[in-house]
From Swiss-Prot:
Keyword Membrane among record annotations: yes
GO cellular component terms, semicolon-separated: cell periphery; cell surface; Golgi cisterna membrane; trans-Golgi network
Annotated metabolic or biological route of this protein: Protein modification; protein glycosylation
Protein name per its UniProtKB record: Alpha-(1,3)-fucosyltransferase 4
Membrane topology annotation: Single-pass type II membrane protein
Job description of the protein: Catalyzes alpha(1->3) linkage of fucosyl moiety transferred from GDP-beta-L-fucose to N-acetyl glucosamine (GlcNAc) within type 2 lactosamine (LacNAc, Gal-beta(1->4)GlcNAc) glycan attached to N- or O-linked glycoproteins. Robustly fucosylates nonsialylated distal LacNAc unit of the polylactosamine chain to form Lewis X antigen (CD15), a glycan determinant known to mediate important cellular functions in development and immunity.
Tissue: In adult, highest expression in spleen, testis, brain, lung, kidney and skeletal muscle and to a lesser extent in liver and heart.
Lumenal side: 75-433
Length: 433
């Protein structure tokens, strides 16, 4: 999976700032090379490098396609079967495994070469290797739980909570100065070592940001496209062989017995998604699954096979923030073969990730009643409903593998970045804007 935008590891001018640019660029590559009016006129005139014969044109077209692929293949997310060039060896220390994974039940870190074709990557879990790591990865939700296991200099000599908090948290005036003094007295980071802040929750569910000291981290790793290491919950990539009827988990339309499904794990009446659900259910039947609210248990066949029996899936995020589209869209809807009904960031933001005809957005309708009327219309008009699946002929869905993929992408970022120093001056201002 490729980070996008201004990220250090992406310096090619061909690379897009958003995933949508990748699939749009792929869709237009043939037109730029072979189908433009200018190219056809040049061919008729016998211009430079374009033979007049049909066989010559075919050869020229293949050559043009190959050259374009060489120049701009970086636009597309690297596929699991791609063969990257050998990279310099890099060690990344996982200071915490997310959500308390460190301990007797934790699994060993992945082999990035086998999983993602990222060679030269060594993931470390032994904190004694702190001094040899080129990058140290911190998971925010674990970072803000408390100070006992913070890294040097905050964990080297000062062992009281009060002293450690003064070093890591900017809760009072002079904390940054004291942290810098601690760097001098208890040992600094190895030269060039990056501290990477990792978080995949929305700003609404990311406590403790305002307390973190300024200039503590060098890089950010998140779902945000403007992160230093951009790892979305999923993305689309071009099929190697476009198909009229691509195979997938979703059953044939005749087997879709239900209309609208929603799987929800946390129920909060104050959330926008719950309020909208109450309005929607007055006008159309919604089957709710999960352990929260009015949900019924997910059947034994599993979540994906359950959702696959429905025409629509409510991909309602727990909060609405830029770029925050999660497994509710990529896994629960797209992978299951249901049309997603989205409540999250605005439509324009979603269209930065997926084709506009692949989803329905609640903002497209003045009320929940009008959305319900449209869903019932699509239920009766099969041809119109099927249009929401046309994109599947050309694109497939990649689901991010947590947490292996973000870890390995950190290795790739270190390998391909330069040595220019950088720090995040105010993490809260960046993430909460």
């Amino acid at each position: 999976m490729a980070p996008a935008g201004r990220k250090l590891q992406h310096e090619s001018r061909c690379r897009p700032s958003r995933p949508v640019d990748a699939w749009r660029a792929a869709a237009t590559t043939r037109g730029r090379c072979m189908g433009t009016p200018g190219a056809r006129r040049t061919a008729r005139r016998g211009g430079w490098g374009l033979p007049r014969t049909s066989s010559g044109l075919a050869a020229a077209g293949l050559l043009c396609t190959a050259l374009t692929a060489c120049l701009c293949w970086g636009q597309l997310p690297p596929l699991p079967w791609a063969s990257p060039a050998p990279q310099r060896p890099v060690s990344v220390l996982l200071w915490w495994e997310p959500f308390g994974g460190r301990g007797g039940h934790s699994k060993p870190p992945p082999d990035c070469s086998l999983r993602f074709n990222i060679s030269g990557c060594r993931l470390l879990t032994d904190r004694a290797a702190y001094g040899e790591a080129q990058a140290v990865l911190f998971h925010h939700r674990d970072l803000v739980k408390g100070p006992p296991d913070w890294p040097p200099p905050w964990g080297a000599q000062e062992r009281t909570d009060e002293a450690l908090e003064l070093r890591v948290f900017d809760d009072q005036e002079g904390a940054v100065m004291l942290a810098r003094e601690a760097l001098e007295t208890t040992g600094s980071r190895p030269p060039g070592q990056r501290w990477v802040w990792m978080n995949f929750e929305s700003p609404s569910h990311t406590p403790g940001l305002r307390g973190l000291a300024k200039d503590l981290f060098n890089w950010t790793l998140s779902y945000r496209t403007d992160s230093d290491i951009f790892v979305p919950y999923g993305f689309l990539y071009p099929r190697s062989h476009p198909a009229e009827q691509p195979s997938g988990l979703g059953p044939p339309l005749a087997r879709k017995r239900g209309l609208v499904a929603w799987v929800v794990s946390h129920w909060n009446e104050r959330q926008a998604r719950v309020r909208y659900y109450h309005q929607l259910r007055r006008h159309v039947s919604v089957d709710v699954f999960g352990r929260a609210g009015p949900g019924q248990p997910v059947p034994a066949v599993g979540l994906l096979h359950t959702v696959a029996r429905y025409k629509f899936y409510l991909a309602f995020e727990n909060s609405q923030h830029v770029d925050y589209n999660t497994e509710k869209l990529w896994r629960n809807a797209f992978l299951a073969g249901a049309v997603p009904v989205l409540l999250g960031p605005d439509r324009a933001n979603y269209e930065g990730f997926v084709p506009r005809g692949s989803f329905i957005h609640v903002d497209d309708f003045p009320s929940a009643a009008s959305l319900a009327a449209y869903l019932l219309f699509l239920d009766r008009n099969v041809a119109v409903y099927r249009r929401y699946f046309h994109w599947r002929r050309s694109y497939a869905v990649h689901i991010t593998s947590f947490w292996d993929e973000p870890w390995c992408q950190t290795c790739r970022a270190v390998q391909t970045s330069g040595d220019q120093p950088k720090s995040i001056h105010n993490l809260a201002d960046w993430f909460q804007r």
